[in-house]
């Protein structure tokens, strides 16, 4: 979790009173943050000011600076209400046009203006420190999002955000005296400890993103560095903020956090000047920032049951107010709270987050200790796990050993090595795999079992192994886009293929699950199973593979639940196994 150093005297001034170390430590504990260190004793006799080093949750981006910590604690203590952010003027007078050329490298941008700001030295330092903390945490070292802040009075609106060839971008980088182009900039900062670590983000791109004003003056080269021309100082009165990124959601979160924390220093506190974002090529034209609170619903009964309370909607609303959330009982549904989530609380994603805030507002120390009911102490296996245990026992009784391979595999192992083609509809792929071994989440248990046999091929024959585990398949209709499926698979490896061995094992499994073999399924409409030749499955030797069909009730529609067959010699060669083998795999969830 991030540790935020704040000036002790300034923080206590913002909180309206002084605290002993023990008192402030207790306040932090109640709120869910942690006082890591008080440097008062360490700086005695020096010119340094005492600091409090506070550890905050990684998802509380609003607490990455002293302003946010003080605001959150003051609301928790009841000293103040949540700020009322407002846009002025309501219709933007300044625009930022995003060109289509930015799409391949850094396609999203957001912007806002803070007018008539009054920053003293410590507020200025806090402004810079917040950007650094956001860059290190939410922005993932500027790979996802990068921030630029500028003295608006040195630039001429409207602004454009586009991508140009490196040699065409010429400007004086921050705190430098000489103009250089994009190519020279990469060489100049290559060994710089601060800037050098960000160069790789765009270095190999044929174009670099750049922020320009109406006179084509460079304001920044995101995500590397700002221009010295528009740098902010203690004398800056009007601040233009630009945020660029590859992630739309995180870009919006960052701009909201910046304006929420530092609009308090405007002549009219919490007043923000919007910017018109013009992005016609992808229909992203909008007014930025969007300070409209998000809305969510939470069940009163759910909150009470989780926290152990018996509070009304009004009482819960008072607790949520301490956590910056504006809640009111729904006028339409008796058990529902309508919750407004401010722009500072991007960590609120689900009603469980709202429930957690109720618990913090109530105080964990105030929760009564109660004995759980005896029946709540008795656990029971999930149905899918119970089925899996039955299949494991039956397989073991048949003389098969259980293996537990990894759920990730390489793309080739999951498809090409099994003589299958990836049509893009099944496998969940890792975006940034660390190694070629972990490119996809397996869609079948077979590759893992074959890899296990490969590493144990020196053992005496036959090798009989099985696995009962999850595979993952895509489903775009689901919110998460994919789902887990519990499968059971077995493999027989020997000098002969041993198809009769895996067929016998399948029969034992079905007998254990009280599922009879149907000799003539077209006439016999009972619950049961049968197999039919599968000419399309190229994993198996031609004419030696079949689909397994299952009817889960009398007169019900049958469906294919798996496959059985003799593995193709090429498959065995791909996994470096010099023997013949047969396999069987079924969806175990059909027995639920």
From Swiss-Prot:
This is Phenylalanine--tRNA ligase beta subunit. Mg(2+) binds at residues 347, 353, 356-357. Pfam families: B3_4, B5, PhetRS_B1, tRNA_synthFbeta. Residues 291-369 form the B5 domain. Its EC number is 6.1.1.20. Coiled coil: none annotated. PROSITE patterns: B5. GO terms for cellular component: phenylalanine-tRNA ligase complex. Tetramer of two alpha and two beta subunits. InterPro entries: aa-tRNA-synth_II/BPL/LPL, B3/B4_tRNA-bd, DNA-bd_dom_put_sf, Phe-tRNA-ligase_IIc_bsu, Phe-tRNA-synth_IIc_bsu_arc_euk, Phe-tRNA_synthase-like_B3/B4, PheRS_beta_core, PhetRS_B1. It comes from the Eukaryota. The keyword ATP-binding applies. The keyword Aminoacyl-tRNA synthetase applies. It is an enzyme of class 6 (ligase). One of its GO terms (biological process) is phenylalanyl-tRNA aminoacylation. Its cofactor is Mg(2+). It is found in: Cytoplasm. Belongs to the phenylalanyl-tRNA synthetase beta subunit family. Type 2 subfamily. It comes from Candida albicans (Yeast). Keywords: Aminoacyl-tRNA synthetase, ATP-binding, Cytoplasm, Ligase, Magnesium, Metal-binding, Nucleotide-binding, Protein biosynthesis. The lineage of its organism: Eukaryota, Fungi, Dikarya, Ascomycota, Saccharomycotina. One of its GO terms (molecular function) is phenylalanine-tRNA ligase activity. It catalyses: tRNA(Phe) + L-phenylalanine + ATP = L-phenylalanyl-tRNA(Phe) + AMP + diphosphate + H(+).
């Amino acid at each position: 979790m991030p540790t935020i150093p704040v000036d002790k005297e300034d923080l206590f001034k913002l909180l309206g009173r002084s605290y002993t170390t023990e008192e402030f430590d207790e306040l932090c504990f109640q709120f869910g943050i942690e006082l890591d260190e008080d440097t008062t004793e360490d700086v005695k006799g020096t010119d340094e000011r005492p600091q409090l080093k506070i550890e905050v949750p990684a998802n509380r981006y609003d607490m990455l600076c002293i302003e946010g910590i003080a605001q959150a604690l003051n609301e928790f203590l009841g000293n103040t209400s949540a700020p009322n952010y407002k846009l002025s003027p309501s219709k933007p007078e300044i625009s930022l046009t995003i060109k289509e050329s930015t799409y391949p490298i850094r396609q999203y941008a957001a912007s806002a203006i803070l007018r008539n700001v009054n920053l003293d030295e410590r507020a200025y330092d806090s402004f810079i420190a917040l950007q650094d903390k956001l860059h290190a945490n939410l922005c993932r070292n500027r790979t996802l999002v990068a921030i630029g802040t500028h003295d608006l009075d040195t630039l001429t609106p409207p602004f454009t955000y586009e991508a140009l060839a490196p040699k065409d971008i010429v400007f004086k980088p921050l705190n430098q005296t000489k103009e250089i182009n994009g190519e020279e900039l990469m060489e100049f900062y290559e060994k710089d400890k601060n800037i050098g670590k960000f160069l790789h983000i765009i270095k190999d791109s044929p174009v670099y993103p750049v922020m320009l004003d109406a006179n084509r003056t460079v304001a920044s080269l995101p995500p590397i560095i700002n221009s010295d021309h528009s740098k902010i100082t203690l004398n800056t009165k009007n601040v233009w903020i630009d945020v660029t990124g590859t992630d739309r959601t995180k870009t919006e979160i960052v701009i909201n956090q910046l304006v929420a924390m530092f609009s308090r220093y405007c002549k009219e506190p919490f007043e923000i000047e919007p910017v018109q974002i013009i992005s016609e090529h992808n229909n992203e034209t909008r007014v930025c920032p969007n300070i409209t609170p998000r809305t969510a619903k939470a069940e009163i009964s759910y909150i009470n049951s989780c926290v152990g309370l018996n509070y009304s909607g009004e009482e819960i609303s008072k607790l949520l107010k301490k956590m910056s959330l504006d809640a009111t009982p729904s006028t339409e549904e008796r058990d529902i709270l309508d919750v407004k989530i401010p722009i500072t609380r991007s960590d609120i994603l689900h009603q469980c987050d709202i429930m957690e805030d109720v618990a913090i507002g109530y105080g964990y120390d105030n929760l009564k200790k109660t004995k759980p009911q005896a029946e709540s102490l008795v656990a029971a296996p999930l149905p899918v796990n119970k089925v899996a245990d039955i299949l494991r026992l039956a397989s073991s009784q048949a003389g098969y050993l259980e293996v537990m391979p990894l759920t990730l595999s390489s793309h080739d192992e999951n498809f090409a090595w099994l003589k299958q083609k990836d049509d893009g509809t099944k496998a969940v792929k890792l975006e940034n795999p660390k190694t070629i071994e972990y490119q996809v989440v397996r869609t079948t248990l077979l590759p893992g079992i074959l890899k296990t046999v490969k590493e144990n091929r020196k053992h005496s024959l036959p090798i009989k192994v099985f696995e009962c585990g999850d595979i993952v398949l895509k489903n775009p209709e689901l919110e998460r886009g994919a789902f887990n499926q519990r499968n059971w698979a077995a493999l027989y490896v020997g000098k002969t293929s041993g198809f009769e061995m895996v067929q016998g094992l399948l029969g034992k499994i079905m007998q254990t699950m009280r599922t009879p073999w149907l000799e003539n399924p077209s006439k016999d409409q009972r619950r049961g199973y049968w197999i039919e030749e599968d000419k399309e499955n190229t994993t198996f030797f031609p004419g030696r593979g079949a689909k397994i069909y299952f009817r889960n009730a009398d007169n019900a529609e049958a469906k294919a639940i798996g496959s059985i067959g003799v593995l193709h010699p090429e498959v065995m060669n791909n996994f470096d196994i010099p023997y013949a083998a047969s396999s069987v795999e079924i969806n175990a969830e059909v027995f639920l």
